[in-house]
Each structure stands twice: as structure tokens, then as C-alpha cells.
């Protein structure tokens, strides 16, 4: 489903999708603690689309599993910031240093109110991850992918009032896929979890085809 969605977007947001693919190669350098290789890969991704620079702070997230309580506090804080509209200042700061004032203004003006879809998406993924938190290993690779996946949810909540907020989260999707693969490979043994996940899969498939099929037209 994720790759299918990215396939649709490739026809409309080609440069950014290329950047997303390249940025995904940078995750291994986080848990290998190779800063310069990480930066180089992110900069290459940014050469296709400047928004890839949002990945740079991820390297400095400590490689450890945080408590569920700490994660919930962070997510609530991100939601409050997003609802307040204060996150738009991030776009403004980026604008002043990148010379993209006109494009950034378009991002800021593209606020269509509270994005319920972002909230539902973030809550659903958080529920799956946190409900199966103990199943996620403690090796560096899984922890890094976990933290990047949680960052994906945080980004959705931070930019919950922006139509373009979801696009910033694309750079974290590959880590989310990796984390969900680990979680669902064990949790699907539970019948209830299996029914819920399959129901969501069918719903998202229909939503993607009906909602994004138009993006097949350049």
C-alpha cells in the first residue's frame, strides 16, 4: 500500500519521490554512526527536492527505546503545536535561509484547517507500534527505524493544519514500513489484530485508488 501510494505520487511529485528514495539510503548511516555519509546522502536527496533537509535532525536523536509515557507526551506536545499553527514558523525559518520565500509562502497559505486524516493516520500507527512495543528488538537498527517511524507520526501532528504537511512525512515512510513489518509479523497471530489490519488495508486501498488515481495524469 505504501509503495502503491508512492507510485501514484511519482507521476505528480517526481523530484520529491526521487529524493525520498535516495533519503531512505541514509538510515543505515544513523545506526552505524557515520555522520558525514549520512549528510552526503541527505544532501544528494535535497538536490532533487529541498524538503529532504528535514531528515538532518534525525541523526541526533539518541539511539534508545523511549518509554511509552515519554512518547505520548511528545506526541501530545506536537499536536498542540500543530493545532496552534506555530509550526508554520519552521517554514518561515527555512524560507529565510534558502531563498525560497515565494514557494514557502505558498506552503504557508495552503492551510485548510484541521486535517482529520493526519490525526487518524498518526493515531493508528501509534496504536499499532505502542500496543506491540515489547516486540520491537533492542538492536540499533530496529531502534533507529522505530524512532524514525515515530518521527513520521510527530511530523503529521506538527503540520496537522497544513495540506502539505503529509509530504514532509514521506521521507520517514521507509522506516515506518520497516517497523510495521517487525510488529505485524508477530501481532497478526492475534485474530483481532489481523481483522483490524486487513480491514484498514482494504479501506486504504480503496481510498488510494479513488483519491489518488487522478495523480496518474502528469
Describe these PLM feature segments.
Residues 1-5:
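Transmembrane and membrane-interface helices of multi-pass
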Residues 11-17:
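Short acidic/glycine- and proline-prone juxtamembrane loop motifs at membrane-interface regions
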Residues 23-36:
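Membrane-interface transmembrane helices that cradle and orient dolichyl/undecaprenyl
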Residues 38-41, 51-61:
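Transmembrane-embedded, aromatic-rich helix segments that form part
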Residues 56-168, 214-216:
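Alpha-helical transmembrane segments and terminal signal-anchor/GPI-anchor hydrophobic tails
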Residues 148, 163, 175, 195-218:
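Transmembrane helical bundles and short interhelical boundary loops of multi-pass, membrane-embedded
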Residues 166-182:
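Hydrophobic/aromatic-rich transmembrane helices and adjacent perimembrane loops
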